[in-house]
Amino acid sequence: MMMNGQKMAAAEVAVQLPESKMVTENIGGAAAAMRPFGRKAEVMNVLLRVLCMVTSVAALSSMVTAQQSSTVSIYGFMLPIQSKWSFSHSFEYVVGVSAVVAAHSLLQLLISVSRLLRKSPVIQSRSHAWLVFAGDQVFAYAMISAGAAASGVTNLNRTGIRHTALPNFCKPLQSFCDHVAVSIFFTFLSCFLLAASAVQEVIWLSRSKY
């Protein structure tokens, strides 16, 4: 009787082992589907967030420090002029969008780093990926529109207006124009980094099964 009981127990174990193996394989497959990216790609995503935050803060700080006073000659008269970023709606737009993008990048960076430290997927689901993708797309378009608007104003300051006596204001206001140019450069760079993040999310969505 004892021998028969031991044989039955061994048979039950033999039957249960394949089932346990199948459950483990299913869990592993689900985890792989939820993490189509490797750790290197997730670290790259975090690095993009860091760079985007740095460039947007640089664009913001360069613009808000753009102010200068000088004199300019118009029809032979020396007139005092003062230039400040807040005098232009386009420059104010750059400041506002850069601040929002910096906050967005910081939030995504904190979320990604916390999940990396817990060794969990940076992107948890398709809905999360779609949400982040939409945010990156919207902010990328906002940054490129802000940079384009600021570029138009800056170009006018550098060239003046044809057929009028208005001069090249960037000659007496060189420091102001340099600050604005640096801000515009970082604005377009932030747009590129947001676009790169959006491409990563598209790749994640194409590889994910859930």
From Swiss-Prot:
Belongs to the Casparian strip membrane proteins (CASP) family. It comes from Populus trichocarpa (Western balsam poplar). The keyword Membrane applies. It is found in: Cell membrane. This is CASP-like protein 3A2. Keywords: Cell membrane, Glycoprotein, Membrane, Transmembrane, Transmembrane helix. It is a multi-pass membrane protein. The keyword Glycoprotein applies. Residues 1-45, 114-128, 200-210 are cytoplasmic. It comes from the Eukaryota. Pfam families: CASP_dom. Homodimer and heterodimers. InterPro entries: CASP/CASPL, CASP_dom. Glycans are attached at N157. The lineage of its organism: Eukaryota, Viridiplantae, Streptophyta, Embryophyta, Tracheophyta. Its main location: membrane. The chain crosses the membrane at residues 46-66, 93-113, 129-149, 179-199.
